[in-house]
UniProtKB/Swiss-Prot annotation:
SUPFAM superfamilies: SirA-like (SSF64307). Pfam families: TusA. Disulfide bonds: none annotated. This is Putative sulfur carrier protein AF_0556. It comes from Archaeoglobus fulgidus (strain ATCC 49558 / DSM 4304 / JCM 9628 / NBRC 100126 / VC-16). PANTHER family: SULFUR CARRIER PROTEIN TUSA (PTHR33279:SF2), SULFUR CARRIER PROTEIN YEDF-RELATED (PTHR33279).
Length: 73
């Protein structure tokens, strides 16, 4: 699993960092995004669905969101 720690960054920062990372990993790999920006919990899942990847988990932690995505293509 590759972790993208985008805490402290605001949208579209976390989304852009995740997209960049997804381009670098192999199909089937999992990317975990950590974001303190609440809008990431909405924006990233929308993009993942449109892009054809799998949204594994969206979870609110104490002071950030954990968004887990699996690259499907």
């Amino acid at each position: 699993m590759v972790v993208v720690d985008a805490r402290g960054s605001y949208c579209p920062g976390p989304l852009m960092e995740m997209i960049k990372t997804l381009k670098q990993v192999e199909v089937g790999e999992v990317v975990e995004v950590l974001s303190s920006d609440e809008s990431s919990a909405k924006d990233i899942p929308e993009w993942v669905k449109k892009a054809g990847h799998e949204l594994v988990e969206v979870k609110k932690e104490e002071d950030y969101w954990r968004i887990v995505v699996k690259k499907l293509k």
